Amino acid sequence: MKTIHLSSAGLLAIAAFSLANTSIAATPGTDNADESAYAAGWSSGSNGGIGFKGWNLVLDGQGDAGGFFIGDSKKTGAADINVNSRSFGMFGHDKAKSTDAYRSFDSPLEVGQSFSVEIGVNFRDGNKGFDLRSSDEKAIFNLNVGADDYTVHLAATGAGSIGTDYSNNTVFKLVFTQTSASGGTWTLTRSGGFSKTLNGTYNGVAAGFKFYAAGTADVPENDLSFNNLAITAKK
Protein backbone atom coordinates (compact mmCIF):
# COMPACT_ATOMS: atom_id res chain seq x y z
CA MET A 1 0.00 0.00 0.00
CA LYS A 2 1.32 3.40 -0.99
CA THR A 3 1.42 5.97 1.78
CA ILE A 4 0.58 9.56 0.81
CA HIS A 5 2.22 12.30 2.84
CA LEU A 6 0.65 15.75 2.82
CA SER A 7 2.51 18.91 3.65
CA SER A 8 1.22 21.33 6.26
CA ALA A 9 0.14 23.65 3.44
CA GLY A 10 -1.80 20.82 1.84
CA LEU A 11 -3.58 19.97 5.07
CA LEU A 12 -4.50 23.60 5.59
CA ALA A 13 -5.88 23.82 2.06
CA ILE A 14 -8.07 20.76 2.62
CA ALA A 15 -9.31 22.16 5.93
CA ALA A 16 -10.15 25.49 4.32
CA PHE A 17 -11.97 23.75 1.47
CA SER A 18 -13.97 21.64 3.92
CA LEU A 19 -14.91 24.68 6.00
CA ALA A 20 -16.01 26.63 2.93
CA ASN A 21 -18.22 23.77 1.85
CA THR A 22 -19.84 23.17 5.23
CA SER A 23 -20.90 26.75 5.93
CA ILE A 24 -24.35 27.10 7.41
CA ALA A 25 -26.93 29.17 5.57
CA ALA A 26 -29.37 31.43 7.37
CA THR A 27 -32.50 29.48 8.28
CA PRO A 28 -35.36 30.35 5.92
CA GLY A 29 -38.18 31.92 7.90
CA THR A 30 -40.25 34.96 8.75
CA ASP A 31 -41.08 37.26 11.63
CA ASN A 32 -43.74 39.90 12.24
CA ALA A 33 -45.09 41.90 15.17
CA ASP A 34 -48.04 39.53 15.67
CA GLU A 35 -45.80 36.62 16.72
CA SER A 36 -46.45 35.28 20.22
CA ALA A 37 -42.99 36.42 21.37
CA TYR A 38 -44.32 40.01 21.27
CA ALA A 39 -47.66 39.38 22.96
CA ALA A 40 -46.48 41.28 26.06
CA GLY A 41 -44.47 43.86 24.11
CA TRP A 42 -41.16 44.25 22.34
CA SER A 43 -37.93 44.35 24.35
CA SER A 44 -34.28 43.35 24.17
CA GLY A 45 -34.02 39.57 23.93
CA SER A 46 -37.42 39.18 22.27
CA ASN A 47 -37.06 36.60 19.51
CA GLY A 48 -40.10 35.87 17.40
CA GLY A 49 -40.30 33.99 14.14
CA ILE A 50 -37.65 31.75 12.55
CA GLY A 51 -34.25 32.56 11.07
CA PHE A 52 -33.24 35.39 13.39
CA LYS A 53 -31.42 35.94 16.67
CA GLY A 54 -32.95 37.99 19.47
CA TRP A 55 -33.43 41.75 19.25
CA ASN A 56 -30.96 44.16 20.86
CA LEU A 57 -32.83 47.42 21.59
CA VAL A 58 -30.63 50.37 22.59
CA LEU A 59 -31.90 53.74 23.83
CA ASP A 60 -28.40 55.26 24.22
CA GLY A 61 -29.46 57.56 27.03
CA GLN A 62 -32.53 58.98 25.31
CA GLY A 63 -34.83 58.30 28.26
CA ASP A 64 -38.41 59.22 27.44
CA ALA A 65 -37.25 60.81 24.16
CA GLY A 66 -36.85 57.35 22.64
CA GLY A 67 -38.77 54.11 22.71
CA PHE A 68 -39.91 50.86 21.12
CA PHE A 69 -43.43 49.49 20.86
CA ILE A 70 -45.85 47.18 19.07
CA GLY A 71 -48.74 49.10 17.54
CA ASP A 72 -50.99 49.87 14.59
CA SER A 73 -48.97 51.54 11.83
CA LYS A 74 -52.11 53.31 10.57
CA LYS A 75 -52.69 55.25 13.81
CA THR A 76 -50.24 57.97 12.79
CA GLY A 77 -51.70 58.33 9.30
CA ALA A 78 -49.03 56.05 7.86
CA ALA A 79 -49.53 53.01 5.64
CA ASP A 80 -50.93 49.65 6.68
CA ILE A 81 -48.03 47.21 7.02
CA ASN A 82 -49.73 45.43 9.90
CA VAL A 83 -50.38 41.80 10.66
CA ASN A 84 -53.60 41.75 12.72
CA SER A 85 -53.20 45.49 13.42
CA ARG A 86 -49.66 45.04 14.79
CA SER A 87 -46.35 46.38 13.50
CA PHE A 88 -42.99 47.15 15.10
CA GLY A 89 -42.62 50.84 15.97
CA MET A 90 -39.92 53.11 17.37
CA PHE A 91 -39.15 56.79 17.90
CA GLY A 92 -36.21 59.02 18.78
CA HIS A 93 -36.58 62.73 19.50
CA ASP A 94 -33.18 63.56 21.04
CA LYS A 95 -30.90 65.17 18.42
CA ALA A 96 -27.76 64.04 20.25
CA LYS A 97 -28.79 60.41 20.72
CA SER A 98 -30.17 57.57 18.62
CA THR A 99 -32.80 54.90 19.27
CA ASP A 100 -31.45 51.69 17.70
CA ALA A 101 -32.92 48.22 17.10
CA TYR A 102 -30.28 45.64 16.14
CA ARG A 103 -30.84 42.09 14.97
CA SER A 104 -28.75 39.37 13.32
CA PHE A 105 -29.74 36.48 11.12
CA ASP A 106 -29.02 33.11 12.76
CA SER A 107 -26.25 32.78 10.13
CA PRO A 108 -25.13 35.16 7.37
CA LEU A 109 -26.89 34.83 4.02
CA GLU A 110 -25.42 32.30 1.63
CA VAL A 111 -25.29 32.82 -2.12
CA GLY A 112 -28.84 32.54 -3.44
CA GLN A 113 -30.57 33.62 -0.22
CA SER A 114 -32.60 36.82 0.16
CA PHE A 115 -33.79 38.99 3.05
CA SER A 116 -36.77 41.34 2.80
CA VAL A 117 -38.62 43.80 5.04
CA GLU A 118 -41.39 46.41 4.78
CA ILE A 119 -40.92 49.92 6.24
CA GLY A 120 -43.63 52.54 6.75
CA VAL A 121 -42.91 56.26 7.22
CA ASN A 122 -44.91 59.48 7.44
CA PHE A 123 -43.09 62.69 8.52
CA ARG A 124 -39.49 63.20 7.35
CA ASP A 125 -37.63 65.44 9.81
CA GLY A 126 -34.70 64.26 11.90
CA ASN A 127 -33.22 60.96 10.73
CA LYS A 128 -34.69 57.48 10.73
CA GLY A 129 -34.08 54.43 8.63
CA PHE A 130 -32.44 51.08 8.08
CA ASP A 131 -28.90 49.65 7.82
CA LEU A 132 -28.04 46.29 6.29
CA ARG A 133 -25.02 45.00 8.24
CA SER A 134 -22.22 42.52 7.63
CA SER A 135 -20.96 39.99 10.17
CA ASP A 136 -18.30 42.48 11.33
CA GLU A 137 -21.17 44.89 12.21
CA LYS A 138 -20.36 47.23 9.33
CA ALA A 139 -23.23 48.97 7.53
CA ILE A 140 -23.16 47.95 3.85
CA PHE A 141 -26.44 49.61 2.80
CA ASN A 142 -28.46 52.45 4.31
CA LEU A 143 -31.91 53.85 3.66
CA ASN A 144 -32.36 57.19 5.45
CA VAL A 145 -35.48 59.32 5.79
CA GLY A 146 -34.68 62.89 6.78
CA ALA A 147 -34.42 66.50 5.65
CA ASP A 148 -37.60 65.98 3.60
CA ASP A 149 -35.86 63.36 1.45
CA TYR A 150 -35.53 59.59 1.08
CA THR A 151 -31.94 58.56 0.34
CA VAL A 152 -29.91 55.40 -0.23
CA HIS A 153 -26.35 55.54 1.14
CA LEU A 154 -23.37 53.13 1.27
CA ALA A 155 -24.54 50.94 -1.63
CA ALA A 156 -21.89 49.91 -4.14
CA THR A 157 -24.19 51.05 -6.95
CA GLY A 158 -27.55 52.82 -7.03
CA ALA A 159 -27.00 55.17 -4.09
CA GLY A 160 -28.61 58.61 -4.05
CA SER A 161 -31.93 60.34 -3.52
CA ILE A 162 -35.02 58.29 -4.22
CA GLY A 163 -36.97 61.52 -4.76
CA THR A 164 -38.48 64.11 -2.44
CA ASP A 165 -42.19 63.57 -3.22
CA TYR A 166 -44.02 63.33 0.11
CA SER A 167 -46.84 60.95 0.96
CA ASN A 168 -48.02 60.15 4.48
CA ASN A 169 -48.54 56.48 3.62
CA THR A 170 -45.15 55.74 2.07
CA VAL A 171 -44.01 52.10 2.20
CA PHE A 172 -40.58 50.86 1.22
CA LYS A 173 -40.11 47.16 0.56
CA LEU A 174 -36.43 46.24 0.59
CA VAL A 175 -35.11 42.97 -0.85
CA PHE A 176 -31.44 41.97 -0.56
CA THR A 177 -30.10 38.94 -2.45
CA GLN A 178 -26.64 37.54 -1.80
CA THR A 179 -25.23 36.79 -5.26
CA SER A 180 -21.60 36.03 -4.38
CA ALA A 181 -19.23 35.69 -1.45
CA SER A 182 -18.37 39.36 -1.83
CA GLY A 183 -21.69 41.10 -2.45
CA GLY A 184 -25.26 41.09 -3.65
CA THR A 185 -28.13 43.03 -5.16
CA TRP A 186 -30.79 45.24 -3.58
CA THR A 187 -34.23 46.25 -4.79
CA LEU A 188 -36.27 49.06 -3.27
CA THR A 189 -39.95 49.30 -4.14
CA ARG A 190 -41.84 52.39 -3.01
CA SER A 191 -45.64 52.30 -2.76
CA GLY A 192 -48.36 54.45 -1.22
CA GLY A 193 -48.99 57.88 -2.70
CA PHE A 194 -46.08 57.47 -5.13
CA SER A 195 -44.62 54.39 -6.81
CA LYS A 196 -41.02 53.73 -7.76
CA THR A 197 -38.60 50.80 -8.03
CA LEU A 198 -34.84 51.15 -7.76
CA ASN A 199 -32.05 48.57 -7.96
CA GLY A 200 -28.38 48.38 -7.13
CA THR A 201 -25.62 46.32 -5.56
CA TYR A 202 -23.91 46.12 -2.17
CA ASN A 203 -20.49 44.88 -1.08
CA GLY A 204 -20.09 42.29 1.66
CA VAL A 205 -22.12 39.44 3.12
CA ALA A 206 -25.45 40.35 4.72
CA ALA A 207 -25.62 39.11 8.32
CA GLY A 208 -28.14 41.37 10.05
CA PHE A 209 -29.59 44.85 10.24
CA LYS A 210 -30.33 47.94 12.32
CA PHE A 211 -33.33 50.28 12.47
CA TYR A 212 -32.76 53.72 13.96
CA ALA A 213 -34.48 57.02 14.77
CA ALA A 214 -33.00 60.27 16.06
CA GLY A 215 -33.63 63.99 16.18
CA THR A 216 -37.27 64.02 15.09
CA ALA A 217 -39.97 66.36 16.36
CA ASP A 218 -41.97 64.93 19.26
CA VAL A 219 -45.09 63.92 17.33
CA PRO A 220 -46.33 60.37 16.58
CA GLU A 221 -46.24 61.01 12.83
CA ASN A 222 -42.45 60.72 13.12
CA ASP A 223 -42.62 57.12 14.36
CA LEU A 224 -40.77 54.57 12.23
CA SER A 225 -42.79 51.42 11.54
CA PHE A 226 -41.65 48.15 9.98
CA ASN A 227 -42.86 44.58 9.68
CA ASN A 228 -42.89 41.36 7.67
CA LEU A 229 -39.26 40.27 7.86
CA ALA A 230 -38.39 37.25 5.71
CA ILE A 231 -35.38 35.11 4.79
CA THR A 232 -35.69 32.85 1.75
CA ALA A 233 -34.09 29.50 1.01
CA LYS A 234 -31.20 29.30 -1.46
CA LYS A 235 -32.25 29.44 -5.11
Model features per residue range: what roles?
Residues 1-10:
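Bacterial N-terminal signal peptides that target proteins for export
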Residues 27, 35-42, 67, 71-151:
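Secretory/extracellular carbohydrate-interaction modules
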Residues 25-63:
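Extracellular carbohydrate-recognition regions
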Residues 198-230:
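Flexible glycan-contacting loops in extracellular carbohydrate-active proteins
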Residues 17-25:
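Sec/Tat signal peptide C-region and signal peptidase I cleavage site
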Residues 33, 117, 166-200:
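Carbohydrate-binding surfaces in secreted/extracellular proteins
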Residues 151-173:
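Short, aromatic/His-centered strand-loop micro-motif at the edge of beta-sheets
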Residues 10-18:
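Bacterial N-terminal signal peptides
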